[in-house]
Regions:
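Conserved hydrophobic/aromatic beta-strand scaffold that supports enzyme active sites
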Residues: 17-19, 34-38, 56, 83-85
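Glycine- and acidic-residue-biased ligand/ion/polar-headgroup-sensing regions
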Residues: 41-45, 50-70
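Non-catalytic surface loops within mature trypsin-like serine protease
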Residues: 39-41, 109-110
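Beta-strand-enriched cores of mature, soluble protein domains
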Residues: 3, 35, 46, 52-53, ...
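A short, N-terminal "cap"/entry segment at the start of jelly-roll beta-barrel domains
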Residues: 1-31
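Short acidic-glycine-tyrosine-enriched beta hairpin
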Residues: 39, 68-90, 96-97
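A short hydrophobic beta-strand segment most commonly corresponding to one strand
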Residues: 56, 85-86, 98-111
Length: 111
């Protein structure tokens, strides 16, 4: 579990992913991917995300705040066990974690 973690493009240092299965081809809008995503304590993103694939997210452990401002303040807090399903085009984030967190995510194109 300690190897294979990389910071995804466009994410700040302290957020890392580990691809578990699959591959997502955003250019051809095909494929699927399963990954773990972890936030180090205190890390936050500064802008919302939007993409053209489905995303299902489960918060395994830690704390996650959604909707913070560019300085990491505010937002709505979510506990472990939280699940979200986002359709293509859904605006979501920014995100932060005060104590760090671990997420299980699936991304896929339907149809």
């Amino acid at each position: 579990m300690s190897s294979g973690w990389l910071t995804p493009g466009g994410y700040p240092a302290g957020i890392e992913q580990k691809i578990l299965a699959g591959a997502l081809d955003e250019g051809n809008r095909s494929g699927s991917r399963t990954r773990l995503l972890r936030f180090a304590p205190g890390v936050f993103t500064t802008a919302p995300f939007v993409h053209e694939y489905w995303e299902e997210v489960y918060l395994i452990s830690g704390d996650l705040t959604v909707g913070n401002d560019a300085e990491g303040r505010g937002g709505e807090n979510f506990p472990p066990g939280t699940y979200a399903c986002r359709p293509p085009g859904a605006v979501h984030g920014p995100f932060k974690s005060n104590g760090g967190c671990l997420l299980y995510e699936t991304h896929y194109y339907a149809g």
